[in-house]
A protein has these predicted regions:
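A conserved helix-loop-beta module that forms one wall/lid of the active-site cleft
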Residues: 22-129
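Phosphate-binding site of ATP-dependent enzymes
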Residues: 78, 111-162
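Conserved oxyanion/phosphate-binding beta-strand-loop segments in alpha/beta enzyme cores
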Residues: 1-18
Length: 162
């Protein structure tokens, strides 16, 4: 327990904070509640950022219906790596990060090999609202995979640090 406290203190001394502190001290304090529906939707947020001239990972496509899942190959084209996210997910739930593809299979960043059927199931789960903030129907965003600089490896866990 003492080791955990020392680690937390060392990170805090370097200006690194946990997500709960970030939310309490910054997100809740400096953001209007009326704007939450905009920022809670990754697609709307991305579109607004682009319109404002802010650089964001390239959006390859959006899937809004079960029928559109058929367009996955068209959306990802020849790309070997990409990310699928629920538009209104939270805390990283529902995000599928593909690091490579070969012979009709896909490798996730954790090294798991999956098939097209598993990607389609993930998309269907996203659309059904399994990962959305309110449990309602959602959209799936397919975008460029950001790979963090190795400097963040020791302070981040499962994902790209904010």
């Amino acid at each position: 327990m003492l080791g955990l406290w020392k680690t937390w203190k060392a990170l805090s001394d370097k200006g690194i904070m946990g997500i709960n502190r970030r939310n309490a001290d910054y997100v809740l304090k400096y953001n209007k509640r009326s704007l939450y529906p905009i920022v809670d939707d990754k697609i709307i947020t991305k579109e607004r950022a682009i319109a404002a001239g802010i650089h964001v990972p390239e959006m390859y496509g959006i899937i809004e219906t079960e029928k559109q899942i058929e367009k996955l190959d068209q959306i990802i084209g020849g790309r070997n790596d990409f990310v699928i996210k629920p538009a209104q997910g939270a805390g990283g739930d529902g995000i599928l990060v593909i690091a490579d593809r070969f012979e009709g299979r896909y490798r996730t960043v954790s090294g798991k090999i999956i098939g097209r059927d598993e990607i389609e199931q993930q998309l269907s789960n996203i659309l059904s609202g399994l990962y959305s903030l309110g449990g309602h129907r959602d959209r799936a965003l397919i975008e460029y995979r950001v790979t963090p600089d190795p400097i963040f490896k020791s302070i981040s866990y499962e994902g790209v640090p904010d």
